[in-house]
Amino acid sequence: SFSQMILNRDTSLTITENGIAFSSAFSGGINSGQFSEIDLNLDGTMDLVVFDKSGNKISPFINDNGNYIYAPKYRSAFPKAHDWMLLADYNCDGKNDIYTYSSGGMAIYENTSTTNLSFSLITSLVLSNYGSNNLNIYISPVDIPAIADIDYDGDLDILTFSILGGFVEYHKNMAMELTGNCDTVAFEFSE
């Protein structure tokens, strides 16, 4: 019905002004960039992905010995994202996965790349144990959570502002405690 096409430009052209070549002439502008690393071309080197929340645009850049080359062909491998997107390795397999906004919370996509960059939805809404109930971890669309191993136990925890924004909530990832592996999505609200 109203399908959208993804067009990839021929970026092999050199654009110059006064004899000076622009290094990323076709990448467009960035207004509210969120920067993450991922191995886009599976060569063992971390590349760069910029998510611009002002247009929900993903801009991939290949790391060529410290020179970042705009590579729009990788955009189609990413799921549709809006408001925010961060890349971090949730399951400790050495491949950065996608954390992104999802209806008052967040979704996680696993990096399933083998020969080509690919992702698979793990959960469309991450829950946390608030004592007696499992509720979604609220993450505002105007903010970005911190996703890091806060307690140094080997799995990624989440820091986010409370729903009213008055304080920071700590959601401890219980994967290592429950299974001994970090490939489980199991969070617990911790004060």
State where each predicted segment sits.
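Beta-propeller blade termini
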Residues: 32-40, 81-90, 141-150
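Residue-level signature of beta-propeller blades and closely related beta-rich strand-turn architectures
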Residues: 52-54, 102-104, 112, 162-164, ...
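Repeat-solenoid scaffold signature
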Residues: 137-175
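Blade-edge motifs of beta-propeller repeat domains
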Residues: 3-29, 62-80, 112-140, 175-191
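Beta-strand-rich domains and repeat architectures in extracellular enzymes and scaffolds
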Residues: 16-55
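Beta-propeller blade termini and top-face loops
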Residues: 35, 102-103, 110-113, 145
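A short loop-to-beta-strand structural motif that recurs across blades of beta-propeller domains
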Residues: 57-60, 105-107, 167-169
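Acidic/hydrophobic-patterned starts of short beta strands in beta-sheet-rich repeat architectures
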Residues: 42-52, 92-101, 152-162
